[in-house]
Amino acid sequence: MEQTQNPNNQRRVISLLVDNSNGVLARVASLFCRRGFNIDSLTVSATNDPSISRITVTLRGSEQALSQLILQTERLEVTRQVFELDPEKSLQRELLLLKVACNTAERAEMREIATIYKSKIIDLSPDSMVFELTGRPEKINAFLKMFSGYDILELCRPGITALERGGKHQHMQKPAQEVRDAQLPLPGTHCPQ
């Protein structure tokens, strides 16, 4: 029997360009929380413009709920742009640090798995190994599955970071401020209740 994925629970990756100032991350995360979204992962990074930061958020939800969230996020005065990244038109990467208990006999097997997945061994002790792997979330999941039979001591997956493919930014239509200005009533008119 073929399984279909629930469209209301699809993983979605949102990219935000925001002002690089104090409290911005808290405001954005608070909005997501108030709207009932559970954040699966969140990364924040600098951009080539020191006044702008990039926030990449991974969450689950329906297209309709996400569209509403994007509109509300665009209304924040700290938001420059916000959009969903299409998995087929974006580069999404995740980092994994994995510490596994091992004995001498298990080391060769673990090194073989690391070689196949192009993982790095970044620490080695008499009773453990630490691996570093970067790749698509599906690759990270497959790597972890290979280690499911071993004693995993610790792991860290900080979150997905992503950019659109291609030379030009596909979402550079209007700055978010223009969107907000277009939603404000003209002077002398009243806001609808």
Give the predicted meaning of each segment.
Residues 1-53, 58-193:
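Long, contiguous binding/interaction regions
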